[in-house]
Amino acid sequence: MKPNSEEEEELVQGVGPWDECFEVAVQLALRAGQIIRKALTEEKHVSTKTSAADLVTETDHRVEDLIVSELRKRFPSHRFIAEEATASGAKCVLTHSPTWIIDPIDGTCNFVHRFPTVAVSIGFAVHQELEFGVIHHCTEERLYTGRRGQGAFCNGQRLQVSRETDLAKALVLTEIGPKRDPDTLKVFLSNMERLLHAKAHGVRVIGSSTLALCYLASGAADAYYQFGLHCWDLAAATVIIREAGGIVIDTSGGPLDLMSCRVVAAGTREMAVLIAQALQTINYGRDDEK
């Protein structure tokens, strides 16, 4: 369902020092969604990055260039962390400066195959604290937003996480990550097996970490975990989950480290701890050390 003009106006209004930034992020996410929807049906030129499963297309670059160039015009003193720029060698460092954290297409493999779970993700941090997140589910025209202290919404409707605390009643989401070597796959499958042995209702992989986290924020799932995601996958969604009443932590059970390439999120702390305790770690290094 596409947000109507009244809903868009409600989404971009607010009280706080970053209102203009939020408004621009919403409009850019909607513009990016139009580009992606059109490109979804067209022939794509696909290349790989870190592995055969880590894909990039010309649309990833086009959308990232649009978002970053427009933001630079409006906010020339701000810093940027963006997926494709980082893949090309840009340093991934979160400072105290106002910083935009951008994934132009989350779910690129889905996009290549025309599987309709694809999103644009724009996060914003100041003094290393996440202020807001905007995620546009392009194919369904769902706009997820969260602002620190102001709640989380989808097309203007307030989001609320599940309050489930029993793993045996939980639907858990995850993603595979780009590593596909035998040892990594063994641990990935073992983690799923542990949760299923604990009688979880199910474990799902949808091909987009940002949208999986949005589904968690909306109460459609009870928990999410992953090794191998990046700060641009996580930044916007973290604000949305927290503002929907959920918790986002490290897989060790400690506080979230945005650069650690690992996460557990849930509607309740009890659920997050249960998931974290069940997991065996897969080491992907850190975003700020690559």
UniProtKB/Swiss-Prot annotation:
Give the metabolic or biological pathway. Answer: Polyol metabolism; myo-inositol biosynthesis; myo-inositol from D-glucose 6-phosphate: step 2/2
- Coiled-coil ranges (or none): none
Question: One MF term in GO for this entry?
Answer: metal ion binding
Catalytic activity, EC = 3.1.3.25
List membrane-spanning regions: none
User: Which residues are listed for Mg(2+) 1 binding in this entry?
Assistant: 83, 103, 105
- Give the record's GO biological process terms: inositol biosynthetic process; inositol metabolic process; phosphatidylinositol phosphate biosynthetic process; response to lithium ion; signal transduction
Family from the record: Belongs to the inositol monophosphatase superfamily.
Protein name in UniProt = Inositol monophosphatase 2
The record lists the organism as Rattus norvegicus (Rat)
Protein's gene: Impa2
